[in-house]
């Protein structure tokens, strides 16, 4: 499965025109059982969003699309997947606030 389709790419570009506090995640990725990424921006290969590696809570930051595409999780070597059913219902900053309270991303 392609992680970023043309439609998603266009939505990510539109998000860049909005003030930071109004940007909603456009796409959700997951993998490895506990890893979750909510992505709101893309510039080249670099994505920005809320990232949770299942260790000690989520944080806002940057991640490389090519790195996500290359990840393989044991024991079966499955890669990162896109949640086809994800629809944001709040801003990225609201998801981040909620993740701080819960200790994980709830999306």
Show which residues each predicted segment covers.
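N-terminal domain-onset segments
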Residues: 1-33, 105-107
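Helix-rich interaction surfaces within compact, conserved domain-sized segments
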Residues: 59-107
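Generic structural hydrophobic/aromatic packing signal, biased to beta-strands
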Residues: 27-29, 49, 63, 68
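Short beta-strand micro-motifs enriched in acidic
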Residues: 40-42
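Catalytic Cys-His active-site segments of thiol-dependent hydrolases/isopeptidases
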Residues: 46-54
């Amino acid at each position: 499965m392609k992680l970023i389709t043309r439609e998603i790419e266009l939505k990510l570009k539109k998000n860049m025109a909005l003030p930071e506090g109004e940007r909603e995640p456009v796409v959700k990725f997951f993998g490895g059982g506990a890893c979750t990424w909510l992505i709101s921006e893309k510039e080249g290969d670099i994505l920005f969003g809320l990232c949770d590696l299942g260790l000690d809570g989520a944080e806002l930051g940057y991640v490389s699309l090519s790195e996500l595409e290359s990840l393989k999780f044991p024991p079966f070597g499955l890669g990162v997947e896109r949640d086809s059913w994800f629809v944001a219902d709040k801003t990225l900053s609201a998801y981040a606030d909620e993740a701080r309270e819960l200790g994980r991303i709830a999306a």
